[in-house]
């Protein structure tokens, strides 16, 4: 092979197959628990061995499993939206949000480990469905694509608020993680709105809430 053809091969643009391989690799990292956080772990409060009863520990683990599933879905959703988005600025915003959600994913996974529990057994299903939903949302156009992101974050904020109310008061480590996640979600929502995201129709918002309820109810146990 000539030098010029070698340079051409090395300098070629990534094609659809490269993108597909990249998405499969990311999905495997998310589902295997191999994803690592770029920011420090928010749970810095010391935890006494007997701080939580077995019942409280199971409840905290159920809530953190729900949060972990939410982050699995966020990864897939935003990657799906970005994969089908043709507007560079919107695509970059979606990928940036997905990258920050990796921190949440890793934090929830670590807290589940500390609580002696595990992620949802249905994570491959949640990831696949959310990625497909993200691709579909992207075809609605950039304003609604970003509006979908903003509404997702708004509903996640409300869901995290509920967890802060029901987590055991003495489970400060879980509470610190959830509080930091809530702050990040608010920033993601605001970024999507500033970038041109528009409010979604009421039926769409209602359908999103219904789907979220099914996911949270199932993930608490499985």
UniProtKB/Swiss-Prot annotation:
UniProt protein name: 3-demethoxyubiquinol 3-hydroxylase
Keywords, ordered alphabetically: Cell membrane, Iron, Membrane, Metal-binding, Monooxygenase, Oxidoreductase, Ubiquinone biosynthesis
Native species: Bordetella pertussis (strain Tohama I / ATCC BAA-589 / NCTC 13251)
Recorded topology in the membrane: Peripheral membrane protein
Involved pathway(s): Cofactor biosynthesis; ubiquinone biosynthesis
Source species, domain of life: Bacteria
GO molecular function, one term: 3-demethoxyubiquinol 3-hydroxylase activity
Binding site for Fe cation 1: 71, 101, 104, 185
Record's function text: Catalyzes the hydroxylation of 2-nonaprenyl-3-methyl-6-methoxy-1,4-benzoquinol during ubiquinone biosynthesis.
């Amino acid at each position: 092979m000539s030098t010029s053809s070698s340079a051409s091969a090395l300098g070629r643009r990534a094609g659809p197959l490269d993108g597909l391989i990249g998405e499969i690799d990311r999905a495997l990292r998310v589902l295997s628990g191999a994803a690592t956080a770029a920011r420090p772990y928010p749970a810095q409060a010391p935890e006494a061995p007997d701080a939580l009863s077995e019942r409280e520990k199971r409840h905290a683990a159920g809530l953190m499993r729900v949060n972990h599933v939410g982050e699995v879905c966020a990864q897939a959703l935003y990657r799906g939206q970005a994969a089908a988005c043709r507007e560079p600025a919107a695509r970059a915003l979606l990928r940036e949000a997905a990258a920050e959600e990796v921190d949440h994913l890793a934090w929830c996974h670590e807290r589940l480990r500390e609580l002696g529990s595990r992620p949802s057994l249905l994570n491959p299903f949640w990831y696949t469905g959310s990625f497909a939903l993200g691709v579909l949302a992207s075809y609605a156009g950039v304003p609604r694509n970003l509006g979908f992101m903003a509404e997702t974050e708004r509903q996640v904020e409300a869901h995290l608020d509920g967890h802060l109310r029901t987590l055991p008061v003495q489970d400060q480590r879980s509470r610190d993680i959830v509080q930091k996640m809530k702050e990040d979600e608010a920033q993601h929502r605001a970024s999507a709105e500033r970038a041109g995201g528009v409010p979604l129709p009421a039926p769409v918002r209602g359908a999103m809430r219904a789907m979220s309820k099914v996911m949270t109810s199932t993930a608490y146990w499985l």
